[in-house]
C-alpha cells in the first residue's frame, strides 16, 4: 500500500475502486440523512493519494440539481449511495456510476412532493475522470418511494454507430425474458 484515504465516519464501500487516467475513483455507502456530509464519488491521484476531485451525489445548496430537493435543508437530504463500483469508457473518457435512492425512502417523510425529483438519486451519472465534472445523467425513477436502488452496474457498448450505456438491472431482466 502506497497511501490510504479515510472515509468519513459511518461511511464505507462494499466494492473496490476503479482506476482511470492516473486516478483511483471510489464511491461510498452509508449515506443516511441527518448529517451535513453527503455521499460523493471521489478520485485520488495514483502516485500521491491526494484528492483530485469530489462529485456529490446529493447536490449541496446552490449546486446544479439542488433545486430538485425542494427547500429541504442539507441535514435532511439523504441517500445517493454508490456502493457498486463504477465503470470506465476509455473511448469517451467517462466513468459511469449507478446511484441509489433518496432517504428516507418515502417522499412524504422527506417533506417533498412527487415533483421534487431528488437528483441524483436513482440515476446513472457520467463523470469526466480527469475533472469529476458531470457530463450527463439519467434519472431512472424520479422521486421514487419504493427503495428501488438503481445503483446497478453500468456498462458501455457499441451498437452500429452508437455508443450505449446499459443499466445492469435492465440487462438482467432482458436476459430472464429470453
Regions found by a protein language model. Give the residues of each.
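Noncatalytic, solvent-exposed loop/strand surfaces
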Residues: 1-178
Amino acid at each position: 500500500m502506497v497511501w490510504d484515504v479515510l472515509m468519513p465516519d459511518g461511511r464505507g464501500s462494499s466494492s473496490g475502486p476503479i482506476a482511470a487516467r492516473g486516478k483511483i475513483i471510489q464511491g461510498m455507502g452509508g449515506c443516511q440523512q441527518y448529517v451535513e456530509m453527503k455521499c460523493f464519488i471521489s478520485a485520488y491521484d495514483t502516485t500521491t493519494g491526494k484528492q483530485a476531485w469530489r462529485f456529490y451525489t446529493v447536490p449541496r445548496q446552490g449546486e446544479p440539481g439542488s433545486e430538485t430537493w425542494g427547500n429541504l435543508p442539507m441535514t435532511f437530504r439523504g441517500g445517493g449511495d454508490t456502493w457498486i463500483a463504477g465503470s470506465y469508457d476509455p473511448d469517451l473518457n467517462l466513468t459511469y456510476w449507478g446511484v441509489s435512492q433518496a432517504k428516507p425512502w418515502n417522499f412524504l417523510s422527506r417533506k417533498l412532493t412527487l415533483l421534487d425529483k431528488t437528483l441524483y438519486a436513482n440515476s446513472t451519472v457520467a463523470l469526466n475522470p480527469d475533472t469529476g465534472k458531470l457530463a450527463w445523467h439519467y434519472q431512472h425513477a424520479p422521486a421514487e418511494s419504493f427503495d428501488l436502488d438503481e445503483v446497478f452496474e453500468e456498462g458501455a457498448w457499441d451498437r452500429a454507430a452508437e455508443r450505449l450505456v446499459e443499466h445492469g438491472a435492465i440487462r438482467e431482466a432482458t436476459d430472464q425474458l429470453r
